[in-house]
Amino acid sequence: MDSTGRQPLSQDGQPWQALASGLGFPDEDQKYWWSVMAPLLGELMKWANYPVDKQYLVLAFCHEYILPFCGPRPTAEGGIFWPTLITKDGTPFEPSLNFYKNKATLRVGYAPACELSGSNDDPINQRAPIAALEHQKRVLPQQNLKWVDNFKKAWFIDNDDAVALKARVHNELFEQAAVQCLIGYVFSDYTQVKVAMSPLWKSVQTGQQISRVIWDTFRQLGDDASSYLDCLSVLEEYTESKQAKLAQVQPSFVNFDVNLKGDYQQSRLKVYYATPCTAFDTMVQVFTLGGRLKGPEVDHAIECLRVLWPSVLAVPENHPDDQDLPRRYHSVAVTQFNFELWPGAKLPVPQIYLPTNFYGRDELEIAEGLEGFFKTLGWSEPFHAYKQNYIATCATPEGKWKAIQHDVSFSFKDSSPYVSVYYKPELSVLSSPS
């Protein structure tokens, strides 16, 4: 192993290179996406100390089941064919590393697309995500798409109606936010699959608020959603409260597991929220659902969040907790949260996404902040030497970044912080689009 604890591989023998040589590509689009995706994933897995056979397994899965649904490559000017707000510049995929106690885990999220996406044959890109999920069934026999079917029935829009709706809205930024379906993977002991679906288009079509569409949909699911109703009622109560109005926070989409070891009704569900506010007091208020989530573990989580917040965000010295951070203009500068709903649970479990892409310190300062935070927790695995690993993984010899730290998520699970760092690939650095 080298000084970061990584297993050495010769530059000519990287798993991603071997797979490219052995499997090839059906077209230049997939060849391009592999050139920007695979080396970064390979380096992240070495950072997380994945054994070589696991690296091959993950990369082979990505080659077969993600690559065909990345859509056309960018234009010569760098324009993304089907941009979404999964990243602020529209890059359609985003890897992340989760750090939890003595383990680091690779995850990948992406917005499936194809040549039909945005055309009159598929104006709001509903085909590619479903095709991607169907395609991967053969290696994920436990995949259950019942939740996908439920929300597809409720929120997908007939093609003719979608054409008319898109023409009526005619708002590029809205279209990038209103993603009908995203897919995420957790490459742990087995491949976990998460699907996110948004009711934004349905909200416009029906004229209802997004929150109303979400709550009504869950109620209409009957027995499928009955074991989640206690948690949902807490979220709905908070969403309609004066506290939520002051925080300008609203739900935006739902997320659920589809590759399950048990019945689909054992799935974890999530409801995502977003707010333009950045005052620390507001973050705590949303994180605790206005004080509805409380107790020693919540108190401990807030203590840890207070340490992490200025470690990665550009918080001015002596900045008051009740004031927003100095504004850095971007049309979608928000802080996101999600709330996990487990069947039979009485209360949701909160998670916050610290918006380093909008309000972060510079890249090395973020890396130093994360390493310092890990040290306060007593985490000391080789992959917790964060700054050194980040430089080794994402810096070029010329001092450019192959990927930037786009978001840092934080939650608390089993009395321990649960931290994920999301890396936005810098396509212009990783590979020329033409």
Swiss-Prot record:
Binding annotation for L-tryptophan: L85, I86, E94
Enzyme class, spelled out: transferase
Organism listed in the record: Hypoxylon pulicicidum
Function: Indole diterpene prenyltransferase; part of the gene cluster that mediates the biosynthesis of the indole diterpenes nodulisporic acids (NA). Nodulisporic acid A (NAA) and its chemically modified derivatives are of particular significance because of their highly potent insecticidal activity against blood-feeding arthropods and lack of observable adverse effects on mammals, in particular the tremogenicity associated with the paspaline-derived IDTs is not observed.
Swiss-Prot/TrEMBL keywords: Transferase
Any single Pfam family the record assigns to this protein: Trp_DMAT
Protein name (Swiss-Prot/TrEMBL): Indole diterpene prenyltransferase nodD2
Pathway: Secondary metabolite biosynthesis
EC assignment: 2.5.1.-
Lineage: Eukaryota, Fungi, Dikarya, Ascomycota, Pezizomycotina
Transferase found in the keyword field: yes
Domain of life: Eukaryota
GO molecular function list: transferase activity, transferring alkyl or aryl (other than methyl) groups
Positions bound to substrate: R107, K194, R268, K270, Y272, Q351, Y353, Y418, Y422
GO biological process: alkaloid metabolic process
Xref: NCBIfam families: arom_pren_DMATS
Family that this chain belongs to: Belongs to the tryptophan dimethylallyltransferase family.
